Amino acid sequence: MKKCLLFLTTIALILSLSTNAFAKNTSGDLSQKQALQLALSAREHFWNTMSGHNPKVKKAVCPSGTFEYQNLQYVYMCSDLGTKAKAVNYLTPIFTKTAIEKGFKDYHFTVSKGKLAVPIGDGDNLLNWKKSTAKLISKKGSTITYEFTVPTLDGSPSAKRKVTFVKENKKWKVNQFDAVI
């Protein structure tokens, strides 16, 4: 009898803990800390995609050379992001589907010879997102907007950036490809 009671108590405890963890994981809220973490991840994914390579992937093959298309100089993406499907797969955990589609269009990504290519750009900026602060400015259903105050690396005045997060497939995502640059 004692074993049965101990077993039932253990099961009840496990169920209550797992239910609690599940509730926290699917919470409707996106905290300031979570918003900043997601913004930092979006920034990293944006710049990695614009440079054509995720540096965390070892042994990716990066083609050399450039080509011109519609008066823009392009470079092929490295093998880790070398097809549209691979790049979309890399961006999907962070950005909404709409943000990815619009980003590919706005930034003139193209497919040439079966490979994804990106226009050659000028690189990063002087915003220090790691030291930014977030303020909730709008919350409507599955859409939350935070305004970030982002200090600069060179000491000039901080920049203000509004970033909208949308819950897509039960996960918060950034709703604009270049929101965190």
UniProtKB/Swiss-Prot annotation:
Keyword Signal applies: yes
Induction: Negatively regulated by the two-component system YycFG.
Keyword Signal recorded: yes
Record's keyword terms, sorted: Signal
Signal peptide extent: 1-23
Superkingdom of the source species: Bacteria
Protein name per UniProt: Uncharacterized protein YoeB
Gene name of this polypeptide: yoeB
